[in-house]
């Protein structure tokens, strides 16, 4: 797992991004210290300045990467994680997780994370019944 300072080669030698978290299990990436080519999981923490890009153009570029199976968008405003999973080539499911016990389960990584664990010590309040996302 690498965090934020690693380039992700979206289009080899043409376009690079800096995801907040990227995980690759591909042996071809094991000896890379600053650049990855075969992500399994990408996590982006949403901010007002990048949210539209993370949801739109960036995700469309990421979807073209054959190794990518999971894409997480993590809100900084409230407890909300949007989880995109590749079901079959070209088909992505979307799950919105908003309850403390809701969990991201990524079998390929033997990883289970509840929202409580994701937001522990983050200073972000759980979603309430009257929550409305702020307009950007």
Where is each model-derived feature located?
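C-terminal interaction segment
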Residues: 3-65, 73-136
């Amino acid at each position: 797992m690498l965090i934020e300072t690693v380039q992700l080669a979206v289009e080899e030698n043409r376009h690079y991004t800096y995801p907040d978290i990227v995980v690759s299990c591909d042996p071809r990436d094991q000896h890379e210290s600053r650049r990855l080519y075969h992500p399994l999981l990408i996590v982006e923490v949403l901010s007002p300045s990048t949210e539209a890009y993370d949801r739109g153009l960036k995700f469309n570029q990421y979807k073209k990467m054959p190794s990518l199976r999971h894409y997480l968008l993590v809100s900084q405003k409230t407890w909300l994680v949007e989880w995109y999973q590749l079901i079959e080539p070209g088909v992505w499911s979307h799950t919105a997780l908003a309850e403390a016990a809701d969990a991201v389960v990524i079998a390929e990584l033997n990883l289970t994370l509840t929202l409580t664990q994701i937001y522990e010590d983050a200073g972000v309040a759980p979603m309430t019944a009257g929550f409305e996302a702020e307009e950007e």
